Amino acid sequence: VEKRFGHFFSQVKWLNMGGGHLMTHKDYDEDELIRILRDFRARYPHLRVILEPGSAFTWDTGCLVATVEDKVSNGGVNTLMLNVSFACHMPDCLEMPYKPAILGTHEPGEGEKRWRMGGNSCLAGDFYGDWAFDGGREPQVGDRIVFRDMIHYTMVKTTMFNGVTHPSIMIYSPSSGFRLVRKFGYEDYKGRMS
């Protein structure tokens, strides 16, 4: 930032250093961040420095559970059609792009069968990635697909494009199991349109 924009620092009062600071991640070097910020503030004491650590507070805290509705193979591409949408429910996957881990899968190696995940909207680009299932397992219609670490951005950037329903929001506790927090329906879509 200093190399490219340092000549502007005398003209501004604050500097936003952006988001994505995963301070709660086990491998994050907090001491290094503190050192960098202190050194920067010593050089530019008039600047108010802002960090956006948003996802640090939701790191690896939420899953999105989808169901396989259909399997399609076309031109050598294997796709699992899901009851969720990348465009509507996981826009960060398409925009950033962010590739979430899926429980029971891994990055496909040479020669492994690859599966693309397809969304349920009519948007032509509503699909993402390639995953291989552990142990060469063949996914089936009705299987649950568990996208890990999906609470950041997913909750705040969703859309109901063409009336695609949002997944329900649930909280899990080991002592009491799952508890429904919110179920979305047509009235939610209608309310957004008026």
What are these regions (language model features)?
Residues 36, 48-194:
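Charged (often Lys/Glu-rich) extended helix/loop segments that serve as interaction or gating elements
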Residues 15-24, 53-56:
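Glycine-rich beta-strand-to-loop/alpha-helix junction loops that act as flexible
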Residues 1-9:
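Phosphate/pyrophosphate-binding loops at sites that engage ATP/ADP/AMP, CoA/4′-phosphopantetheine
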Residues 3, 14-17, 142, 174:
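Solvent-exposed, well-ordered amphipathic alpha-helical segments
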Residues 26-31:
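Metal-dependent catalytic neighborhoods of phosphoester/phosphodiester hydrolases
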Residues 9-13, 45-47:
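Short, well-ordered coil/turn segments that N-cap beta-strands
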Residues 3-4, 34-44:
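Alpha-helix-loop-beta-strand connector modules within alpha/beta enzyme cores
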